[in-house]
Amino acid sequence: KPKKGEESVVVCSFGDASITEGEVAEAFQMASLKKLPILYIVQDNEWDISAHASEMRAVDATHYAKGFGLKTYTIDGTDFINSYKTINKALKEIRNKRSPILIHAKVPLLNHHTSGVRMEWYRDDLEEANNRDPFPKLKNILLQNKFTKEEIINIEESARQTVYSDYERAIKAEDPTPEDLFTHDFAPTKILKEEGERSPKDKEPTVMVDSALFAIKELMSEHPECLLYGQDVGKRLGGVFREAATLADTFGDNRVFNTPIQEAFIIGSTVGMSAVGLKPIVEVQFADYIWPGLNQLFTEVSRSNYLSNGKWPVSCIIRVPIGAYGSGGPYHSSSVESVLSQINGIKIAYPSTGADLKGLIKSAYYDPNPVVILEHKGLYWSKIKGTSKAKTIEPSKDYIIPFGKGRVVLENKNTDDTMCIITYGMGVYWALNAANNHKEKIEIIDIRTIFPLDEKLVFDTVNKHGKCLVLTEEPYNNSFAQALSARIQKHCFENLDAPVFGMGSENMPAIPLNSTLEHTMLPNAEKVSDMIKEILAY
């Protein structure tokens, strides 16, 4: 534990133009709400690139931050002594009161934005900016404080030598090889094989949502660094699907807590949590709500390990209830796996049973990389007809499933006039129910994880039967499923007896609220059965 007055403080420095980003508002909101020890330093030169602050900002950084309850100091950032004193004062206050402070430092812009965007093209304040240059002002302060001109020259020369030495060192550093491009996309994981007991004896099947709940409860009991947060997961409700029920009561509000409707914060905060040794499990309440968080997922979470040469993997789990269920309508029914599959640097699971969900949550926890787990709402309670097999015996505490390992749901050793269905999530149950109409003709593979994908199982199964249907809940055009179909077509071409078929929802912008239209849009067992007939007859 640090000594009094030496507690850690986070320093966040950014420009005045970036303060208008919506994610800054989310950060200020949570910093103020949770009394986080953060010092925000805004360097305000009044310019974006060519747009001036008077055109772009309704209020300056000071007034904006006060709206979130942050204490602020406004300073002349070219005044070294006042800046130094104010920053020290702010740090002491943050440590004593444990609350965020923003310092609004007004500074000149002394150079071009880039070599291709020249300041003389659009600015009429260049003389004024040069008159505010902090460097000559600092030299005058040093002279007033008994430094000699020779001492100041020596300080300047020492700084030049340091910069030049660092530059020379960088120039002499070995260039990367082409092979270096392919390192550090993921941190290595130790979870390489399935372990533990999947179906212990003398137990009754449990619903899928409880399998996840039990997995997280076991993890939080064993690991004090494990946190769970998101919208409505706290004590009052325990999740809108009861997926976090009792966890806040058991582990306290400091480890299980609600967040505002701030998906960018929910996802982006995992970077910092992971960096200080915590393991965040966060929830985006519906897949439809993940869009505001994609910037953080794409630009920060997925790339951290790669851009830091393996030093800063973001170890987190992002739970996302997904899929159409019970006329949820256009804002509660979407599928998002195709977009997520285009984000390199994250792992994606989409289990179809409680046992798989528990095993994959455990695997994700011990994986040092960011993992998104897509959990179909219609399978949580097995209330949809034909999904009872989503209920499973709860696996043992040590049960774990490696990513990139699919499951044979329905095996078929017969290869005479047969076919296979490659699917995941709700598609597993459409396929199973359709297969009842085609006895001994169908083999079903549940890929379980979208990335990494069990290509060997998929390709071996397609090669075995020669005919294949890739089944998804998403609209099929331009989807992950369609891309998978192309991979199968390429790798299994010589053994195919028919083109690789694909089926998904109708290619419409959204899933309607009306139940008749929802039913019309989605695949179902009857539609799958009809396509099976077509493929077998090909």
Regions found by a protein language model. Give the residues of each.
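Thiamine diphosphate
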Residues: K1-V11, G22, E26, I41-K172, R242, T246, W312-V314, ...
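DG-centered beta-turn motif at the end of beta-strands
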Residues: S8-I19, K35
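Active-site glycine- and acidic-residue-rich loops that bind
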Residues: A17-G22, T78-I87, P351-K358, Y365, ...
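A short alpha/beta connector and helix-capping loop motif
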Residues: E21-V42, S302, Y306, E455-D460, ...
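Glycine-rich, charged/polar anion/phosphate-binding loops
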Residues: V24-A27, K85-K92, R303, A355-I361, ...
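Hydrophobic/aromatic ligand-binding patch that stacks against planar heteroaromatic rings
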Residues: M30-S32, Y64, E93, G272-M273, ...
